[in-house]
C-alpha cells in the first residue's frame, strides 16, 4: 500500500486498525481500507446512507481500498466467494469514537474557513474530535471550542 509522503497531513496507519474474523483487517482511515489474507473473497464497499455499491470485486489476497478519501459513511462487506452472507459487515459509526481531523500547518485563511465545518461534523456525529494544527492557531481557537481537543502534528 502506498503511503502519503511529503505532505502536510498525518498518514494513516500502515495496516488497518480493526481486526475482523479470519484475519481480515479493516478500517475507515483515509477512506475504507480492507486487508485480506489468502483466500477467495468477494468485497463490497457501499455508501451506507444511499446503499449504493461504490466498488465490488473478487480478490484472492491483498488490499481493497476506496477511491474516495473524504468522509463517506462507508459500509464494508466481505464474503467468501459463492456465499450469500457476509463474513464481515461493518458500517462506519462515529458516535463516541475518537476522530482526527488533520489541518495543514502554515495556513490561516483556509483553516479558519473550514474549521466551523469540523465543529459541525462533531455535533452531527457526536464523536470525540481532535484537530491537529499549528500551535498559534490552537491558541486562537481552543478557548472558543472547549469540546474539541487540539494538538500539534
Which residue ranges define each predicted feature?
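Catalytic machinery of carbohydrate-active enzymes
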Residues: 1-153
Amino acid at each position: 500500500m502506498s503511503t502519503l509522503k511529503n505532505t502536510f497531513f498525518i498518514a494513516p496507519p500502515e495496516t488497518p486498525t480493526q481486526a475482523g474474523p479470519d484475519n481480515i483487517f479493516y478500517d475507515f482511515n483515509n477512506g475504507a481500507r480492507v486487508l485480506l489474507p489468502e483466500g477467495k473473497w468477494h468485497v463490497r464497499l457501499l455508501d451506507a446512507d444511499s446503499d449504493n455499491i461504490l466498488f465490488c470485486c473478487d480478490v484472492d489476497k491483498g488490499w481493497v481500498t476506496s477511491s474516495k478519501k473524504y468522509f463517506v459513511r462507508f459500509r464494508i462487506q466481505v464474503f467468501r466467494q459463492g456465499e450469500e452472507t457476509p463474513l464481515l459487515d461493518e458500517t462506519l459509526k462515529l458516535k463516541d469514537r475518537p476522530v482526527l481531523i488533520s489541518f495543514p500547518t502554515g495556513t490561516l485563511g483556509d483553516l479558519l474557513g473550514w474549521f466551523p465545518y469540523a465543529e459541525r461534523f462533531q455535533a452531527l456525529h457526536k464523536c470525540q474530535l481532535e484537530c491537529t494544527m499549528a500551535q498559534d492557531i490552537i491558541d486562537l481557537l481552543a478557548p472558543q471550542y472547549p469540546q474539541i481537543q487540539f494538538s500539534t502534528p
